[in-house]
């Protein structure tokens, strides 16, 4: 059953068990999964080798927007240059972008794989995946995909995350409280996994809601179901804000866990990682601003990919920034077996 505490049987540090994580009993992702057709034996990738975790992951995070070109001869040259770089750097793991973000706003305008909902910029993911498999030493390839940040064609007339001050701020994200949106998101993932035999999925850093979000009417209905009064929505300093944030975190992470459950129907040994904002690691109170937390992350994902980017966080002391992240991450993952630090190579 999705969204139950027993969804993943992981051995977690005491620091994780010590905190009570809410469970969203009536999560709509349950209905989405219940109504899905089960994959046939042919669709399930049974013959794929079992994914064994890599003791020391050496990762390249690749943005296909820089490989894509309308000139297909140039695009092939770009692919070959990428493969050569992978051969030179010798990573054992690749995080490979599967969505297109040409306007660089963090949301998917198009994708690099065939599907029924999003415009296809080019079926580039499959090409690059095949080249990596055939011509490099890489052991695992993860598809980097959004959970909420899908900008679908406007004629779909979908509901998006609303900011309390009006309109949309940050990434353009489908409201996670709308059943129709969840149906679409799951269908996009099903279209992807049936034709792209990846080892894992990296969930984008769009799995987040600020303390001003989601302010849509449907979101407010959920907040009331969780036991929060209208007063809390008008006062960001309300003492219940921290508890509301925990519920939003639980809702988002259990949504991602539901998607993972669907993917594993096709790829039983799939591994999943999530991008986490760095302030959440040393400052648990940041959960109110991001709806992300360390305990919930290690509950619902195989890996926590922390965006350890001091320039983005405007940190003056980069060494201290990194050491603080390591120290605090060890409170939840003592051996850092399930923690990834994504480093910023340029400002």
Regions found by a protein language model. Give the residues of each.
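Polysaccharide-binding and catalytic clefts of secreted carbohydrate-active enzymes
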Residues: 85, 167-300, 306-312
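Aromatic-lined substrate-binding rim segments of carbohydrate-active enzymes
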Residues: 82-83, 100-146, 240, 244-266
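Active-site clefts of carbohydrate-active enzymes
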Residues: 62, 273-280, 329-347
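Boundary/entry segment of secreted carbohydrate-active catalytic domains
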Residues: 24, 28-39, 47-78, 346
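Glycine-rich, aromatic-flanked loop segments that form ligand/cofactor-binding clefts
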Residues: 93-95, 124-167, 202-208
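Alpha-helical scaffolding within the catalytic cores
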Residues: 81, 282-296, 318-331
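Catalytic domains of carbohydrate-active enzymes, especially glycoside hydrolases
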Residues: 77-103, 195-200, 297-304
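Active-site-adjacent "subsite" loops/lids of carbohydrate-active enzymes
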Residues: 53-76, 140-191, 195, 238
């Amino acid at each position: 059953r999705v969204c139950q505490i027993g969804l993943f049987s992981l051995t977690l540090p005491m620091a994780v068990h010590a905190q009570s994580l809410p469970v969203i009993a009536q999560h709509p992702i349950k209905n989405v999964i219940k109504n899905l057709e089960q994959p046939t034996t042919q669709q399930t990738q049974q013959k794929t080798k079992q994914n064994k975790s890599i003791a020391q992951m050496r990762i390249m995070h690749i943005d296909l927007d820089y490989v894509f070109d309308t000139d297909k001869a140039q695009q092939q040259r770009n692919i070959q240059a990428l493969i050569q770089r992978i051969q030179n750097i010798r990573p054992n793991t690749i995080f490979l972008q599967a969505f297109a973000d040409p306007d660089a706003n963090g949301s998917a305008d198009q994708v690099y794989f065939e599907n029924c909902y999003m415009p296809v910029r080019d079926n580039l993911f499959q090409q690059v995946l095949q080249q990596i498999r055939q011509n490099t030493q890489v052991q695992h390839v993860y598809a980097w995909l959004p959970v909420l940040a899908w900008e679908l064609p406007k004629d779909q007339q979908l509901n998006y995350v609303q900011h309390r001050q009006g309109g949309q701020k940050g990434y353009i994200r489908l409201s996670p409280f709308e059943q129709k949106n969840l149906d679409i998101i799951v269908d996009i993932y099903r279209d992807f996994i049936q034709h792209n035999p990846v080892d894992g999925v990296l969930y984008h850093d769009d799995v987040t809601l600020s303390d001003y979000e989601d302010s849509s009417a449907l979101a407010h209905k959920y907040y009331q179901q969780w036991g929060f009064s209208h007063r809390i929505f008008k006062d960001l300093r309300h003492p219940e804000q921290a508890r509301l944030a925990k519920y939003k975190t639980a809702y988002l992470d259990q949504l991602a866990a539901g998607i993972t459950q669907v993917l594993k129907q096709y790829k039983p040994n799939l591994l999943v990682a999530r991008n986490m904002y760095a302030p959440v690691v040393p400052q648990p109170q940041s959960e109110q601003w991001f709806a992300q937390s360390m305990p919930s992350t290690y509950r619902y994902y195989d890996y926590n990919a922390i965006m350890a980017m001091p320039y983005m966080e405007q940190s003056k002391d980069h060494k201290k920034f990194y050491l603080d992240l390591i120290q605090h991450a060890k409170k939840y993952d003592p051996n850092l077996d399930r923690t990834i630090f994504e480093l910023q190579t340029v400002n």
